[in-house]
């Protein structure tokens, strides 16, 4: 096996030219009793998994400085080598995550106590000095030379072991992951919490060096509104009393330090490793992935960007229709960047635990929607429950089994069921990966808005609310409305997207705050001029990135939006009724601004609050209110989305008579989703094919359309194909007891697990099946 390679085509990984779907689960060997390892790994294989993922905890394997145990001499659960050999014996691939930091609800995130105690200077600092030593993840100054020195020593011990078990050396390790979610131990979410370590803030320290590298003094005077004779006069901001551009620069500076840190680790790992090197969610932000993409591209780092999906934490798992907007957004922005990096998309932490209970239908909704939206490689976290060794616990005391698919005692929990069948579908229908998701509509993200939303900071002079969680990303947000209106969308970064990339979309939605860079405003102008259809709400920007007046977009559109302050206290906001043609009293929240100019399309009484402007070859819809998701009998909000599509001539790729059936087109497959736990039925038209569908409860079907499977040319099937053999197809339909199969030639010779109930037409068969799975021989 020596010399075998792990390669990829940007969608899937290939092991010696054989494309595979990475379908794995997390078993942290150091938390599971040694004598359970084989049983748990065999159970994982029986669930259809082909990969096991694990951290390697630095402080577990080096409990005292210079004293290492990788063979279990001091504790059987330190036998890393034995674990790797067992996984290989059982035919499982391995993804390994050796830190230095692993997070993982583990003591110090894996950083040894002895290192912190002997070198407290490596700890990050607040503006007021040191943090309490007992915080669960003591934040480290990533670029402190002492920390880097010890991190490299750790790597020099663990990486030779990893090298021996690489797939390319005859082992089973197919990827090595750098650190874990390098986000300053999640304090990046609070702009002034870290890092004021001396090596950063001292005169001519890292902060001043970064400013010199990125700005002239003249640029900084323009941005900060002050005069400077030297960079050393510019102290890091410590509160929101500083100019917003300076606070944003401090935020981006810390992101840059993370990137620098990741580069140092990457270069060390690459000395030992020739398989893909990966990184999970840099910064734990989304739009800020722009900074990661630009950095690794500039430095020519071959790092595979991976992501994660969590929808509860130590509470009952809750993934229903109102989470679809956020899911569409996160998968969209992730697809955008991995397509630019040209590496396979992979969710390394797909939530399968850390919840009081996970209902199998809600688990199915999340697990099936990820591949439907372009993430075909999945790892379920945490797949196998365990216990924390004494002295290494963090959040959980002794327990590390919080409703994992396989419990500490070996029991298999209910959400194993969707994990099994989704894996069967993905592995038996590799061509699904090549039937790519491509939307006609995009949401345009402007990265600086993410930080303001994250911090909850609205400059006093701003008029629009920065609460994007409520109005955009959240359960009632605009993006959930688009998802539930059957408007599948991509996400693009407005700062780095080219005009050509933007024009691939018939329509782009933009949520605007008070400011937007002059360059982005110019791009949106060009997009409309060249035939694009813009929807922008709930205001138009009137400031540029330096918070200086800039009304280029407003001037081009010839539209004035009323200057009215949104209210931030949710108890003090008004509820208003908007009318439009065919729309009677659609409720909107917070202030609604008058829009002057263009053709009126929405109003409150005599006040116009929405218009359409036709410019050049395209158009723009300007709304002075926040369009959100409300589900009701009258369903005004989804009807208003329909109206906007119609006004701008944007047609859906799929027609569904029942709008509660969500359709995601994938060329030769159509993913149908019932996000609600009630029966839905309707007619579907797609690619010249029309059929009826019934879904008795919450769940997902992968419908093949005009595709050949196992030598059978299907016109369509209202069930999910999950395997079979030559001219045999195994199907699964758990949402109805009848399924419709249409074929181009031949006939059905037999049905195992069901029977032909009716022949509706030439080669169109209705199958009644007693069980959820049935197999047809053609």
Curated annotation (Swiss-Prot):
Transmembrane segments: none annotated. Its EC number is 3.2.1.-. The keyword Cell cycle does not apply. It holds the Pfam family Glyco_hydro_42. It is found in: Cytoplasm. Pathway: Glycan degradation; chitin degradation. Its main location: cytoplasm. Keywords: Cytoplasm, Glycosidase, Hydrolase. GO terms for molecular function: 2-acetamido-4-O-(2-amino-2-deoxy-beta-D-glucopyranosyl)-2-deoxy-D-glucose exo-beta-D-glucosaminidase activity; beta-galactosidase activity. The active site is at residues 181, 349. Changing residue 349 to Q: Loss of activity. Gene3D superfamilies: 3.40.50.880, Glycosidases (3.20.20.80). Exo-type enzyme that specifically cleaves the non-reducing terminal glycosidic bond of chitooligosaccharides. Catalyzes the hydrolysis of GlcN-GlcNAc to glucosamine (GlcN) and N-acetylglucosamine (GlcNAc). Involved in chitin degradation. Can also hydrolyze chitosan and chitooligosaccharides of various chain lengths. PANTHER family: BETA-GALACTOSIDASE RELATED (PTHR23421). Belongs to the glycosyl hydrolase 35 family. This is Exo-beta-D-glucosaminidase. The lineage of its organism: Archaea, Methanobacteriati, Methanobacteriota, Thermococci, Thermococcales.
């Amino acid at each position: 096996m020596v010399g075998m390679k792990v390669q990829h085509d940007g969608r899937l990984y290939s092991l010696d030219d054989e494309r595979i779907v990475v379908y794995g689960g997390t078993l942290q060997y150091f938390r599971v009793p040694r004598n359970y390892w084989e049983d748990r790994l065999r159970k994982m294989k029986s669930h259809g998994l082909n990969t096991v993922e694990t951290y390697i905890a630095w402080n577990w394997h080096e409990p005292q400085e210079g004293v290492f145990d990788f063979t279990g001499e001091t504790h059987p659960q330190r036998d890393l080598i034995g674990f790797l050999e067992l996984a290989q014996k059982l035919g499982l691939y391995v993804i390994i995550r050796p830190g230095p930091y692993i997070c993982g609800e583990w003591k110090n995130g894996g950083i040894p106590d002895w290192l912190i105690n002997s070198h407290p200077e490596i700890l990050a600092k607040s503006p007021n000095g040191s943090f309490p030593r007992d915080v669960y993840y003591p934040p480290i100054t990533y670029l402190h030379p002492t920390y880097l020195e010890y991190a490299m020593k750790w790597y020099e011990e663990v990486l030779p072991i990893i090298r021996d078990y690489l797939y390319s050396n005859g082992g089973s390790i197919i990827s090595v992951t750098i650190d874990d979610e390098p986000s300053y131990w999640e304090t990046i979410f609070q702009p002034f919490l870290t890092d004021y370590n001396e090596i950063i803030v001292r005169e001519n320290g890292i902060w001043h060096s970064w400013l010199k590298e990125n700005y002239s003094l003249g640029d900084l005077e323009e941005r900060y509104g002050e005069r400077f004779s030297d960079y050393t006069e510019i102290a890091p901001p410590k509160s929101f009393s500083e100019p917003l551009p300076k606070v944003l620069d401090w935020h981006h500076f810390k992101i840059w330090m993370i990137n620098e840190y990741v580069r140092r680790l990457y270069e060390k790992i690459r000395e030992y490793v020739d398989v893909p090197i990966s990184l999970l969610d840099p910064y734990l932000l989304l739009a800020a992935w722009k900074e990661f993409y630009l950095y690794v591209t500039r430095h020519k780092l071959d790092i595979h960007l991976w992501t994660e999906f969590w929808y509860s934490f130590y509470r009952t798992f809750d993934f229903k229709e109102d989470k679809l907007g956020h899911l569409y957004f996160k998968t969209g922005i992730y697809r955008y960047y991995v397509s630019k990096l040209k590496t396979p998309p992979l969710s390394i932490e797909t939530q399968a635990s850390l919840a009081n209970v996970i209902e199998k239908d809600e688990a199915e909704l999340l697990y099936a929607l990820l591949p439907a939206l372009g993430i075909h490689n999945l790892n379920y976290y945490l797949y196998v429950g365990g216990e924390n060794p004494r002295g290494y616990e963090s959040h959980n005391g002794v327990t590390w089994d919080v409703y994992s698919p396989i419990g500490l005692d070996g029991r298999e929990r209910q959400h194993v069921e969707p994990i099994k069948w989704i894996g069967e579908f993905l592995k038996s229908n590799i061509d699904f990966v090549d039937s790519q998701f491509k939307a006609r509509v995009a949401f345009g993200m402007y990265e600086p808005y993410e930080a303001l939303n994250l911090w909850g900071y609205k400059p006093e002079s701003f008029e629009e609310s920065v609460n994007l969680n409520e109005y955009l990303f959240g359960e009632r947000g605009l993006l959930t409305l688009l998802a539930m209106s059957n408007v599948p969308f991509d996400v693009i970064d407005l700062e780095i997207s080219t005009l050509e990339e933007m024009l691939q979309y018939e329509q782009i939605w933009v949520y605007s705050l008070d400011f937007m860079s002059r360059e982005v405003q110019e791009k949106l102008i060009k997009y409309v001029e060249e035939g694009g259809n813009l929807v922008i709400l709930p205001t138009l920007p009137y400031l540029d990135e330096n918070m200086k007046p800039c009304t280029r977009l407003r001037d081009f559109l010839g539209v004035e939006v009323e200057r009215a302050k949104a209210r931030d206290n949710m108890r003090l906001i008004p509820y208003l009724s908007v009318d439009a043609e065919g729309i009677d009293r659609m409720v909107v929240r917070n202030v609604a601004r008058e829009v002057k100019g263009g053709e009126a399309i929405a109003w409150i009484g005599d006040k116009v609050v929405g218009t359409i402007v036709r410019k050049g070859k395209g158009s723009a819809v300007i709304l002075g209110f926040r369009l959100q998701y409300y589900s009701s009998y009258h369903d005004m909000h989804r009807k208003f989305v329909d109206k906007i599509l119609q006004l701008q001539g944007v047609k859906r790729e799929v027609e569904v008579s029942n709008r509660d059936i969500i359709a995601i087109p994938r060329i030769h497959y159509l993913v149908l989703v019932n996000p609600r736990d009630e029966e839905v039925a309707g007619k579907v038209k797609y690619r010249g094919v029309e059929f009826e569908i019934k879904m008795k409860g919450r769940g997902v079907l992968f419908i093949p359309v005009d595709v050949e499977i196992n030598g059978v040319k299907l016109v369509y099937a209202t069930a999910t194909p999950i395997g079979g053999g030559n001219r045999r197809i195994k199907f699964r339909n758990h949402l109805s007891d009848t399924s419709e199969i249409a074929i181009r030639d031949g006939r059905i010779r037999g049905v195992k697990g069901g029977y032909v109930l009716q022949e509706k037409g030439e080669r169109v068969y209705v199958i009644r099946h007693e069980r959820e799975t049935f197999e047809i021989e053609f």
